[in-house]
């Protein structure tokens, strides 16, 4: 059983598998991949993106049990400056920022190509390129203010945090940030936050108006043990920051800050 099966689908795409929603899915990558496999449909297309090799193996085995047509990253398609597969290649520009988004885009291209002979026969290469140029995902490496800079990212588990860190190192090498962070109690926020401590000028732990939110004092105490400068702040303090800021750790936080920045712009 999987809740995604409530909707009909000609294709199912798994972009990556990480340690999240473990209360529902399992406590290991293998268990989570096995649970996610319930989303695959019989005799449909199954696209497996770039992720943990053990997870990829489990996903493929389960997809084939359902007689799905499987396309696997690194074997059937891949990304190396452009989309590549045994049937051809495609150059594309991507509006979404973040190294992992290039791999996700490649999985999306493979899905369209797999369906092009039946469901999507009116879509050509230029349509795909235009779609990727215009693709937008709020709260994913999103710049909501340019000067000083505010970047929002929904990373709230170790896997997503690693993707964010890789992207920051590539796009802003050596840059230090004022970090605004909050997390839910049921998330592995210590592993998330630890990946960014060497990038922090200061960590502002944002007090969140949600019952599930971790106590900011608990997070500050953890940072104190790590020797990292930190303090508690309110959500409104993010947009008052007069230096470059990085906001992550909770989708609730990202959503609230995004609304605050939009309201600040519209108030002028």
Identify what each model region corresponds to.
Residues 238-262:
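A glycine-rich beta-strand to alpha-helix segment
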Residues 76-90:
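Acidic-glycine-rich active-site phosphate/pyrophosphate-binding loop
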Residues 3-6, 17, 21-24, 204-222, ...:
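Flexible, gly/pro- and Lys/Arg-enriched active-site loops
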Residues 1-13, 17-22, 31, 88-202:
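Nucleotide phosphate-binding/pyrophosphate-handling subdomain across enzymes
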Residues 45, 149, 176-180, 243-246, ...:
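Residue-level preference for the first positions of well-ordered beta-strands
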Residues 49-51, 62-80, 95-99, 125-135, ...:
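Beta-strand->loop->alpha-helix junctions that form or flank phosphate-binding loops
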Residues 49-69, 80-82, 149-150, 158, ...:
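C-terminal helical cap/extension that packs against the catalytic core
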Residues 1, 6-66, 189:
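Conserved catalytic-core segment of NTP-binding enzymes
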